[in-house]
Each structure stands twice: as C-alpha cells, then as structure tokens.
C-alpha cells in the first residue's frame, strides 16, 4: 500500500479476535502517539493508545517511536487514522514526566534542602575525599564533582548533599572560607534551586539586572563558574580602579547561569587596566576570559613584503629590459 509506513489486509475470514491477537503481542514499535480506528464490514471496534498501554509495558512504549501516516481507505482493508496528534504528544510527554518524577522521588525534602555548592576545589579532589571532609558536619547523602565533558577534568566545584538542612548549615559554618588542599573553598546553598523554587528565579534575575549600572566602558567576561552569582562577580572586581558594576547573565526559562557576564567601569583607562589585570585570573576554579564588550576581532592586514636595495635595482633592470 503506497504512502503508508506499514500495511496489512483483512480478508473476509479475518475475525476481531485475530486482529486483537496481533495487537496484544510485544511490539517492536510504539503506537503511543496514535489512535487506531479499525473499520471493516466484518468487524467494528476501536483501539486507542490508552487501551494498548494496558497490554504493553510503559517502558517499551517509550523506548521507540514510529509515527504512522494516514493510510488510504480500501475495501476489505484497515484504515489508520491519526487523531489529535498534538494532544497525544503532549499527553505522552506529561505521562513520561510523571513516571520519571515518581522514579526519582527517592530523597526526602529535608535531604533536598541539604544540597550545597562547594567551589574553588583543587582539581585533583575526588568524591570520596570530599565526602570524608564533609562527614565532619554530619551525614553525607551524595557528592557530585562536576567534570568537563571534553577533557574529563574537574571544573573545580561540586555539589554536596547533606542529610538535613541543619547539617548543611553546619557544613557551611565549618568549611566556608576554609583551606582544602591549599585552596580557600566556598560553601553555600546553590543560587539556583531545584523544583518549584525555580518559580521565584525570574524575580531574582530582574532584581539582579535592575541593580546593574551600565557604562560605555564595559568588559565581557566568559568561562564563569555555573554557580557564580552577580554578587560574587562584583566582589572579584571590587578592588579594581574605576569599577562600577557587574552582572551574571541568566537563562530566563531555567534560571541557570549562562556562564558569562558584564563588568562596567567609569573610564576607558580603568576598563583597560582591569582587562590587563584580571584576564586569565582564576575565579572559583575557572580562568576568566575577558574582552571589551562589543569589540570585533581585529581584521588581519596582508603581510608586508620587505625589499632590499639590491632587489629594487634588480627589479628596475628587469622592467627596463621588458619595456625595450
């Protein structure tokens, strides 16, 4: 049957039982996004995705997805009708999200509240070493050191989840500003929380941007730690002459840092001084990448060919011989 992803024919002897048998076998494809309406002179019944899910494991339905186009109606055949595709896709995504949330809901609310950001760690620090250190403050539920996906090297920060909020506060008291492996670590609650707390992030972002003082003398800063706040960026540049303001740029939908920001100064001289002083300086385990905001890369000029007096005289003689 042309134009269809699959086809099958129902003969006069085909019964509804045999067709149901076909659909109750373990599928090699997903029909989660479709509603199948089957009509024939010998049978008249309807199968939709909700009923099919009673026969198929949900995990197998989500593992693969084959979208079936509408097949032409033929006599003694089966017509496949695609109904409310957008609603089916939205429903499917919603159901999948609910399943994932149920599977991931293994930690209590108190444990979630005990999640800490730990910055400026030694690059050689391991999860087990960090867990041993924080065990001084209480029960350590989880340790996640963040690694670069390309180099597989530690990015110098981690997230430590303590057994309770009280233990997390004790860890902040004990370790924030302390020396770990020769480095002064920073320990606090993450600026961007999980779950429903993200709803208040848009207001926080607006507040951060409103406090920013703009200036034509502005630096663009990249390669920022994901957990670095606008206040942290201001603190890093506060001692620079002519410093005015700084802000980290956040994604408005997720509330997460985009890894870059801007710093403003009162004059071009102050801006250039900070550029020379702070470029490549490490902040929370990552070297800053500074550039003048809006500055385009300089266009490379063609190489200058130097000629000696001897070459000039040789060229003159050659031109004279050619013209004569």
Curated annotation (Swiss-Prot):
It is found in: Plastid, Chloroplast. Could be involved in splicing and/or processing of chloroplast RNA's. One of its GO terms (biological process) is mRNA processing. Residues 294-324 are annotated as: Disordered. Residues 1-71 form a transit peptide. It comes from the Eukaryota. Keywords: Chloroplast, mRNA processing, Plastid, Repeat, Ribonucleoprotein, RNA-binding, Transit peptide. Residues 114-192, 217-296 form the RRM domain. The keyword Chloroplast applies. Gene3D superfamilies: 3.30.70.330. This is 33 kDa ribonucleoprotein, chloroplastic. One of its GO terms (molecular function) is mRNA binding. GO terms for cellular component: chloroplast thylakoid membrane; ribonucleoprotein complex. InterPro entries: Euk_RNA-bind_prot, Nucleotide-bd_a/b_plait_sf, RBD_domain_sf, RRM2_NsCP33-like, RRM_dom. Residues 298-308 have a biased composition (Low complexity).
